[in-house]
A protein has these predicted regions:
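Nucleic-acid substrate recognition interfaces
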Residues: 1-427
C-alpha cells in the first residue's frame, strides 16, 4: 500500500472512544512516555544550543557536544538510557512520534524567523499521544492493517468497536456521516497517524488521519460566483455582496459565569494547599475543576460549530473566496482587542475555510490587507494623512468621486478586486 504523502486526498475523522480501566491505564502510560521522551530530547537540544554558542571560546565543550548529538541521533541510545520505555504497555510508535514532533519543533525554530525556542511539555489532566497504523505488504484496504473495525457477530451491520495499536478493541461512537465515510472508504485508503487523547472533562477520543486517491466527498457544483470578505469584531465578516454575518461572541457571553467558576476553583486550590492536601485527593477541587472544564468546552464547541456552519455555507455558495491576509498573532498583542480577537477566532475560521475549499473543489486565497479600508472601491483613491479614516468611523464619503461608503462593505469590495487582479495575472 502506498504512503499517505503519495496519495492525493486527505481527511481527518475523530471518533469518541470508551476505553476500559486497563485501556485508560495504557493511554496514561503512553502519554507519560511521549512527554518524557519529548522533554528529554528538548533538554538535550537546549543544552546543545547553549554549548555550541560557547564552543569556540571553550574547546572543552566539544566532548559534551559530541555525546549529546550521539544520544539525539540514536533512538536505541535513548531507549537504553530510559528502561521503562521497554515495558509492554509502551507503544514504540508513540516514542517515534514524540521524537518526530520534537524534531519538527526544532526545525521550525531554526527556519522560521520569530519562532521561540521549543519549551517543555507540562503534565496536565488532559492526555494525548500519537501512534501509526501498520499494513502487510499488498494490503488494499485500510481494514487490513492493525487499525480496523471489530464486529462481534457475523450479522452486525454497524460496527461498534475499533481496534487500535496496543489498546486492542475499543468501543467507539461517531456521527452517522463520519461512520458512513469510514465504512464506504475502505479500498485504496490508508490510515496514517492516530492521535489518542483525553480532554480536560475526562472524555476520550481517537483522531484518524486518512489518505486516499479517491475523493472523500463529492465536490460542490460550480456557481460562477466569487466574493470578498472583510473580517471584523462587531460581526464575523461582511462580504462584497453586502451580507453581514453576525458574531455570536460565545466567550463574552460565558465570561461572567466562567470567571465565577474559576474564582471558586482558585479558592479551593488555596484551601487544599493550606491543608497540605494533594490536589488529586481534594475531591471538591476536582469536582469544581470538572465544572470549569465543562464550561470552557461548551464555549469552544459552540464557537467551532458556528464556524463549521458558516465556512461550509460560504464554500457551498461561492467558487472563489478572497480574504485579507491578517497577521492574527501580531494583532493579539494589542491587549485592548486580544480577548475579542480570540473570541471571534479568525485563525480557526481561515483554517476551516481553506480545508473546506480543498475538500469541496473550491478556491480560497488571501490578499495583502494594506489600505483595504482606506481605498475607495469606486475610483481607487487612497485616503492618506489627515484624511485617513479612524477606527470608529463606520461610514465615509470619497472626496474624489463622492461615493458614500459603508466601511466594511467597501473593504470587502476592495479585497475581491485585489483577488480578481491576482487571478487575472495567473491566467
Amino acid at each position: 500500500m502506498r504512503k499517505c504523502a503519495d496519495m492525493k486526498y486527505h481527511f481527518a475523522a475523530e471518533v469518541r472512544i470508551y476505553p476500559s480501566s486497563q485501556q485508560k491505564h495504557i493511554i496514561a502510560v503512553n502519554d507519560g512516555a511521549s512527554r518524557f521522551v519529548y522533554n528529554r530530547m528538548t533538554a538535550n537540544d537546549r543544552e546543545l544550543h547553549s554549548l555550541k554558542k560557547a564552543a569556540s571560546l571553550c574547546p572543552a565543550y566539544k566532548g559534551k557536544i559530541a555525546y549529546l548529538e550521539q544520544v539525539r541521533s540514536s533512538k536505541r541510545e535513548l531507549v537504553n538510557t530510559i528502561p521503562f520505555l521497554k515495558e509492554k504497555d509502551v507503544d514504540s510508535l508513540a516514542v517515534d512520534n514524540a521524537i518526530k514532533n520534537h524534531n519538527r519543533a526544532w526545525e521550525r525554530f531554526r527556519e522560521v524567523p520569530g519562532t521561540g525556542i521549543p519549551g517543555f511539555h507540562k503534565k496536565s489532566y488532559a492526555q494525548s499521544y500519537q501512534t501509526n497504523a501498520h499494513y502487510k505488504k499488498g494490503a488494499e484496504s485500510w481494514e487490513e492493517g492493525n487499525v480496523h473495525f471489530v464486529r462481534r457477530s457475523a450479522g452486525e451491520q454497524v460496527p461498534h468497536f475499533i481496534s487500535l495499536p496496543i489498546l486492542g478493541a475499543i468501543r467507539f461512537r461517531c456521527s452517522g456521516k463520519v461512520l458512513a465515510m469510514l465504512t464506504s472508504h475502505k479500498e485504496d485508503t490508508r490510515v496514517g497517524t492516530i492521535t489518542i487523547r483525553r480532554d480536560n472533562c475526562g472524555d476520550y477520543y481517537a483522531s484518524l488521519q486518512l489518505s486516499s486517491d479517491i475523493p472523500f466527498t463529492d465536490p460542490f457544483p460550480r456557481t460562477g460566483s466569487c466574493v470578498g470578505i472583510d473580517m471584523n469584531l462587531t460581526n464575523l465578516y461582511t462580504d462584497s455582496d453586502g451580507n453581514v454575518i453576525p458574531n455570536p461572541k460565545y466567550g463574552r457571553g460565558m465570561k461572567k459565569k466562567l470567571a465565577k467558576a474559576q474564582r471558586k476553583l482558585s479558592r479551593m486550590k488555596e484551601a487544599a494547599v493550606r491543608d497540605n492536601r494533594s490536589l488529586n485527593e481534594a475531591s471538591n477541587y476536582q469536582k469544581q475543576r470538572l465544572r470549569t472544564a465543562v464550561l470552557q468546552r461548551k464555549v469552544s464547541r459552540s464557537r467551532e460549530d458556528y464556524l463549521q456552519v458558516q465556512t461550509k455555507r460560504l464554500v457551498e455558495s461561492q467558487d472563489l473566496i478572497v480574504s485579507e491576509d491578517l497577521k492574527v498573532k501580531n494583532m493579539l498583542r494589542n491587549h485592548k482587542l486580544a480577548y475579542s480577537i480570540a473570541d471571534v477566532s479568525w485563525g480557526s475560521f481561515f483554517i476551516l475555510l481553506r480545508q473546506k475549499a480543498v475538500l469541496y473543489g473550491k478556491e480560497f486565497m488571501k490578499v495583502p490587507a494594506k489600505d483595504t479600508t482606506q481605498t475607495c472601491s469606486g475610483c481607487g483613491y487612497v485616503m492618506k494623512g489627515e484624511e485617513k479614516i479612524p477606527l470608529g468611523t463606520e461610514e465615509w464619503t470619497c472626496p474624489v468621486c463622492g461615493i458614500h461608503h459603508l466601511r466594511d462593505y467597501n473593504s470587502a469590495r476592495n479585497v475581491l478586486q485585489r483577488g480578481l487582479a491576482v487571478k487575472a495575472l495567473q491566467i
